[in-house]
């Protein structure tokens, strides 16, 4: 892989993580392709979810590889109660080994989300983030100073494009239980569909956000506090912001930046809106004051 796009103080750790992923893609793919990969285990993770076999196998594989990096002090999986910590290193990695596992048996797109933090697991210390999506193609998206997209081909990640969202999109990925949506959110969504936006929600957050990114705009929304800050929300929020979009939530009817949120506990959850600029304005108009 050509690393010419990665510059700045955090470039080296990003390159090291990508290098590990590039070498490990085939192993990860083998794990996902096993006939029983989507079978549920009899275990329960720290968030109260029942992981599938591929979740645990990918988690073990990634943890071992991330801990092998000299400059990584701590590694924290969504599947674990607390981080695994070493004596040395400057960076902390939080990751969701298999986002979208609940729809894997339907052969939908799934992926691995990774946040690279510095000093501690706080949003303001998020140095970079990336994800890998597994489908008929394997792709990598990385946020450092900008957002870069790669495709895996012949054992290497090849650069496709620098992603920048346009002001307005045409995709809506609205997750959660619609009966619990506020009246403002229902009106905002109705307005998008009146403007011929297309519904593209799969149940895999990484897949739906990837769709918004490659279509250069739109809305991903999850108004219930179900998504984990450290492993899903913060890393994808950084990617959206670096792609010139907005990442926000509403606190008593006031729109606030996701990456300004604090973290009171490791597995704390949040609502989440990831959008291009126009859609952010529309959502604020309808949800303000609710």
From Swiss-Prot:
Keyword Electron transport found: no
EC number, as in UniProt: 3.1.3.11
GO molecular function per UniProt: fructose 1,6-bisphosphate 1-phosphatase activity; magnesium ion binding
Any coiled-coil regions, as ranges: none
Gene Ontology terms: cellular component: cytosol
Keywords annotated in UniProt: Carbohydrate metabolism, Cytoplasm, Hydrolase, Magnesium, Metal-binding
Cofactor note: Binds 2 magnesium ions per subunit.
GO biological process: fructose 1,6-bisphosphate metabolic process; fructose 6-phosphate metabolic process; fructose metabolic process; gluconeogenesis; sucrose biosynthetic process
CC cofactor: Mg(2+)
Major place of residence: cytoplasm
Pfam families: FBPase, FBPase_C
Annotated substrate binding sites: 99-102, 201, 226
Binding locations of Mg(2+) 1: 78, 96, 98
Residues binding Mg(2+) 2: 96, 99, 232
Pathway: Carbohydrate biosynthesis; gluconeogenesis
Keyword Magnesium: yes
Catalysis performed (reactions): beta-D-fructose 1,6-bisphosphate + H2O = beta-D-fructose 6-phosphate + phosphate
Assembly: Homotetramer.
PANTHER family: FRUCTOSE-1,6-BISPHOSPHATASE-RELATED, SEDOHEPTULOSE-1,7-BISPHOSPHATASE, CHLOROPLASTIC
Entry similarity comment: Belongs to the FBPase class 1 family.
Protein name: Fructose-1,6-bisphosphatase class 1
Organism of this sequence: Helicobacter acinonychis (strain Sheeba)
Organism taxonomic ancestry: Bacteria, Pseudomonadati, Campylobacterota, Epsilonproteobacteria, Campylobacterales
């Amino acid at each position: 892989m050509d690393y010419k796009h990665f510059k700045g103080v955090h470039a080296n750790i990003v390159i090291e993580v990508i290098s590990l992923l590039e070498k490990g893609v085939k192993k990860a793919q083998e794990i996902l392709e096993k006939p029983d990969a989507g079978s549920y285990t009899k275990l329960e993770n720290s968030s109260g979810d029942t992981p599938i076999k591929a979740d645990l196998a990918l988690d073990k594989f990634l943890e071992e590889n991330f801990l092998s990096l000299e400059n990584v002090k701590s590694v924290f999986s969504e599947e674990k109660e607390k981080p695994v910590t070493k004596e040395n290193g400057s960076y902390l990695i939080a990751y969701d080994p298999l986002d979208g596992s609940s729809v894997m048996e339907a052969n939908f797109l799934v992926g691995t989300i990774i946040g690279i933090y510095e000093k501690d697991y706080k949003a303001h210390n998020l140095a970079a983030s990336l994800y890998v999506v597994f489908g008929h193609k394997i792709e990598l998206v990385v946020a450092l100073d900008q957002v870069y997209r790669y495709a895996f081909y012949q054992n290497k990640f090849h650069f496709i494009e620098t992603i920048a969202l346009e002001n307005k999109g045409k995709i809506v990925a609205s997750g959660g239980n619609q009966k619990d949506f506020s009246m403002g959110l229902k009106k905002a969504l109705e307005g998008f569909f009146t403007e011929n936006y297309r519904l593209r929600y799969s149940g895999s957050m990484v897949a739906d956000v990837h769709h918004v990114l490659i279509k250069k705009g739109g809305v991903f929304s999850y108004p219930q506090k179900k998504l984990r800050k450290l492993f899903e929300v913060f890393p994808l929020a950084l990617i959206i912001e670096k792609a010139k979009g907005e990442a926000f939530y509403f606190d008593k009817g006031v729109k606030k930046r996701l990456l300004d949120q604090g973290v009171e506990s490791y597995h704390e959850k949040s609502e989440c809106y990831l959008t291009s600029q126009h859609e952010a304005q529309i959502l604020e108009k309808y949800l303000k004051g609710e």
